[in-house]
UniProtKB/Swiss-Prot annotation:
Pathway terms, separated by semicolons: Protein modification; protein ubiquitination
Associated clinical condition: A dominant de novo FEM1C variant was identified in a patient with neurodevelopmental disorder with absent speech, pyramidal signs, and limb ataxia.
Top-level taxon of origin: Eukaryota
Outcome (variant: residue 126 to H): Found in a patient with neurodevelopmental disorder with absent speech, pyramidal signs and limb ataxia; likely pathogenic
Function per UniProt: Substrate-recognition component of a Cul2-RING (CRL2) E3 ubiquitin-protein ligase complex of the DesCEND (destruction via C-end degrons) pathway, which recognizes a C-degron located at the extreme C terminus of target proteins, leading to their ubiquitination and degradation. The C-degron recognized by the DesCEND pathway is usually a motif of less than ten residues and can be present in full-length proteins, truncated proteins or proteolytically cleaved forms.
Known outcome of mutating residue 121 to A: Reduced binding to C-degron with an arginine at the C-terminus
Gene3D superfamilies the UniProt entry points to: Ankyrin repeat-containing domain, Tetratricopeptide repeat domain
Repeat positions for TPR: 245-279, 338-371
Full protein name: Protein fem-1 homolog C
Gene name per UniProt: FEM1C
One cellular component term from this protein's GO annotations in UniProt: nucleoplasm
Ranges occupied by ANK repeats: 2-31, 40-70, 82-111, 115-144, 148-177, 181-210, 213-242, 481-523, 527-556
Amino acid sequence: MDLKTAVFNAARDGKLRLLTKLLASKSKEEVSSLISEKTNGATPLLMAARYGHLDMVEFLLEQCSASIEVGGSVNFDGETIEGAPPLWAASAAGHLKVVQSLLNHGASVNNTTLTNSTPLRAACFDGHLEIVKYLVEHKADLEVSNRHGHTCLMISCYKGHKEIAQYLLEKGADVNRKSVKGNTALHDCAESGSLDIMKMLLMYCAKMEKDGYGMTPLLSASVTGHTNIVDFLTHHAQTSKTERINALELLGATFVDKKRDLLGALKYWKKAMNMRYSDRTNIISKPVPQTLIMAYDYAKEVNSAEELEGLIADPDEMRMQALLIRERILGPSHPDTSYYIRYRGAVYADSGNFKRCINLWKYALDMQQSNLDPLSPMTASSLLSFAELFSFMLQDRAKGLLGTTVTFDDLMGILCKSVLEIERAIKQTQCPADPLQLNKALSIILHLICLLEKVPCTLEQDHFKKQTIYRFLKLHPRGKNNFSPLHLAVDKNTTCVGRYPVCKFPSLQVTAILIECGADVNVRDSDDNSPLHIAALNNHPDIMNLLIKSGAHFDATNLHKQTASDLLDEKEIAKNLIQPINHTTLQCLAARVIVNHRIYYKGHIPEKLETFVSLHR
């Protein structure tokens, strides 16, 4: 164990005597260097504060002049917090004496993590009331929110810490402050079921506001299934009759899909239906649908007590009612709407009803692409689920275990929607796509292409497939490390796209069809690797031969001056007879001479040849 690690471990474990011995013979500069260095992203002081070693904290500050504000990585409940200063770590862990000492030594009371979380928020999160009071007494700002606009009062409400919420309110916390998504502290109470805190907030004049999705605290409680909040708010003076009805119907839908309690759902739906007809002079009927939805098996919402009673004998119809109600009340843009459609589809798939699953998932995917930003993780999850489902169906079909077939149209439809997602992302120039999300979407598309190659098709269908792949390639999308689709097709890491296996990469079939549809075999990634380099790194001679036959330069070099043959295992070269001399032209040799002898060529040869020579740098 090196000295740096030994110092770090001693500070983390509170072994002051050991640390003193380790530093005894070191100069002031050496001590400063050892104390300021990070191990696993954290300084010794940060670890000492995290684990509450008061004597160690004071020794590091007073004897070693450790920097009191330097943040780092700390772990709480399995989550790594980045950029956490020592005061934040001590506050989150509940070490009051360490907090007091750090503040006495000049720590900034409002210093934040990378996500803009303050020490006060950290203390509020885990319910450390005494630390909350101490921080506030030392000028902690109650209104500093994290990157999501979530305040200390909001997190106290969500976590159910009533005494802390009350203290913050007494100190003047803004009860109606909104987060980035429009949530208020009332929403947090509704989502967590904290009824007592909600009542207290209302006493402090909290307003029933809608969030960014149009959700009131009452609807939030219905979505999360907190019946105590729903019962309380449906009797509140600020709640209209229509709002009460919607809340009860939505709560019933939650009982169907989240709690799996069909009788409980019927109870709330009956309450809502009775309210609709309670005033015979002003019956509140459900809106008449413009069209019936095939994915819901053309179901219609029940509109009378008699129709509601008829649902008891048909559980499947009840589940469709839940989806219809949720979509009507929450709207297609709310994440829960598409989530539970997908959930219901997955249940059908588990029971072998793949057709119903595919129909529901397609409907959810259309909803997501119409309402979410390009390359949304939710949309990517839907596309991946399709790839995993189709792979499972094809495998079982091949084993003769499955009656349902995967059609070309099913697969092709999802491929088209996947390409559409890439088009949407590339068109959004003001907000460039996240490379990791784009990489995932590209990988999913390659898996779908791989699956399509396993499905028989007509000449017309084959033309449409290649036309779509051509359109995809013309977008020139790039993933992680600036990988093109062809780079991804020859890389083994493309195999790992989700939890379940779909296709194995490198894939000769996918590589072949990409090349046939116009993929550039000499395209470069961020390290100047061509697909041939990546195929060599993955020891795949068959793909290398295909790339070379398609025009890939065998002796082209990357940023590290390596050719593909430099990267390929020598045994593979001998075994598969990939001899460099067989693929090296006189042009290539001439280009190498120019590069090796540093002959200045720019402006002296045609531009096309300049590009060719640059491949051999």
